[in-house]
Amino acid sequence: RIYSRACLDLVQRLNGHDGGSDLPVRAFSHVTGGGLAANLARVLPRGLMATVERDTWSLPPVFRLVGELGRVPQSDLERTLNLGVGMVAVVDPEVAAKSISVLVDAGIDAWEMGTIGALTDDAAAAGLDFVQGAKGVDGGAVLMRGQYAA
């Protein structure tokens, strides 16, 4: 899927122009190879951590099938595939609902999947559910929490 038009529309509607600082749309992460956590971590500044709640979406059947038939552990699926999340928009919490509305109006499945806050000293204790400094970028971190919705 190509997200460029929807992303541009979101920036223009919420930020009022094509970018800048201290604006509600902060970043986009196109989730391709390398999985959701690694792709999201590299668009976050160092010292910040996204907590992604797995129960905010259901895995598309194809990913469940790959896991089951291929005996691929969830951790490997998460480090390799997008698991149904093709694009993440990082926005200020105050505009989350408006962002979702703009994207849904554009025909994009959209939902709030988590929060962003300061990286905590104990976050790395989450093991495989924690990613920091991914894909050669010394950026932020992502903690994947919970179980996927049924």
What spans do the regions from the language model cover?
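Glycine-/charge-enriched secondary-structure boundary and capping motifs
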Residues: R1-A150
